[in-house]
Amino acid sequence: MKLSLPALLDAGRRYTMAWLPRPSRPRTPREGRRIVLLAGLGLATALALPPPFVHAQDWSAERWVGTWGAGPGGPPLPANTQTFTDQTVRLVVHTSIGGTRVRIRLSNEMGTTPLRIGAAHIALRASGADIVAGTDRPLTFGGNASVTLPPGAPALSDPVDLNVPALSDLAVSLYLPGTVGATTIHGTASQTNYVSLPGDFTGAASLPTQRTILSWPFLTEVDVTGNAAAIVALGDSITDGTRSTPDTNNRWPDWLARRLQTVRDPAGGLNNRLGVVNRGISGNRLLSNPAEGSLAGRSIQERFDRDVLATAGVRYMTLMIGINDIGNSSAANPVSANDLIAGYRQVIARAHAKGIAVYGATLTPFEGAGYYSAEKEVVRQAVNAWIRSGDEFDGVIDFDRVTRDPSHPGRFLPAYDSGDHLHPNDLGYQAMGNAVPLELFRSIGSSWLKADAPGQNAGSAVPGISMPAASYK
């Protein structure tokens, strides 16, 4: 089969992707299913783009892009449900990219009664429960200061002008009149949030705090405007950052976001127009829903549309999921490598149908964890071998290789083990974030998208990374 795709670039436009036949020639995992397009207007400029989609988009225009997000994992059991009575919650979130306008997304997805938000504000956070003077912005919903979310429904605020820096803290304050149960909640925030004394303190410079919580109730996304795109990190507790130090933003997606803002590409540019939205949920699974009340969320199969497709500006996603499926399998409910591979293929197909590149991450070691067994380790190794094969994912992130003990590959490197033999510590999460190849995420309009320099591999945007040419035989 011969595949040839000459393409012209209009001024100020970049080509992202559309389905193309897979090349029949062998390829390496690092190549994924990338294609090379030739720029027109008489120029032979080679663009190395992520996987197999091609449609024109004007990346010079502003658009909404997720800068922060969380996957709701409720509802909790009634006895464990947090309640708020005529109180203000001030929720702290850490941005990945910046912008000049901002909006929030709320959710009553798991509620059984209407959720009334009496008032909502957003501001830059100074420290603790205090906000930066002059940055407080009241939020409206369809022009109204309050909003009522029916059971199962989300709500998107109207946009407001606010200069939001990258890698900064925002404070989202929600006034909850009456008595409200936090049924839609992200239970493992690894971030201190604040609950006020009774009253509406959404605009207060310093919140009069009654108690603190380590969860994010009702808030699921913060978006900013910019000529940017988003990466969704989809996974379980290891993506969620379980056992990282609270209030330090040491989850591996946080480290990826820092690198995108600060690490220069081979030509000296920054890949800093990519937001990172963390959709990890502790205890989450690929194939099945965990026990009710565990706050472990619906399966990846069930929540994919909500947590990936509905994310503003999503263009890429990483997928690290399956260790809880393996660990919780039993003789009565076995989970095989083939079961997980079939689930991965579903996620890949659904993402590709919407033009989203999918990068598979290997499963990290778990020997010594409570649900470990030698038989389950065989399944993990088989899954990782399939992921590394590069046959179906658009690229591979080898977290297993980065975190395992070379002298005992079934275990975490001791320096990276949080102590439960399942989750990394802060150093382990940093190593994972630093191990993500930035060349997987092509800068939008950056110098990475350029003609080959002398000595570069033909068709490659990064020295030393071999990519397929524009014609296959």
Please report, for each region that a protein language model flagged, where it lies by residue.
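Conserved SGNH/GDSL esterase-like catalytic core that processes O-acyl groups on lipids
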Residues: 68, 85, 90-91, 114, ...
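Catalytic His-Asp segment of secreted/periplasmic serine-dependent ester chemistry enzymes
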Residues: 285, 292-293, 297, 327, ...
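Surface-exposed amphipathic alpha-helices with a cationic face
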Residues: 344-352
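N-terminal export leaders
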Residues: 16, 28-41
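Active-site-proximal beta-strand/loop segments in catalytic clefts of secreted hydrolases
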Residues: 107, 175, 234-237, 279-282, ...
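N-terminal secretory targeting modules
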Residues: 37-46, 53-234, 240-248, 265-270, ...
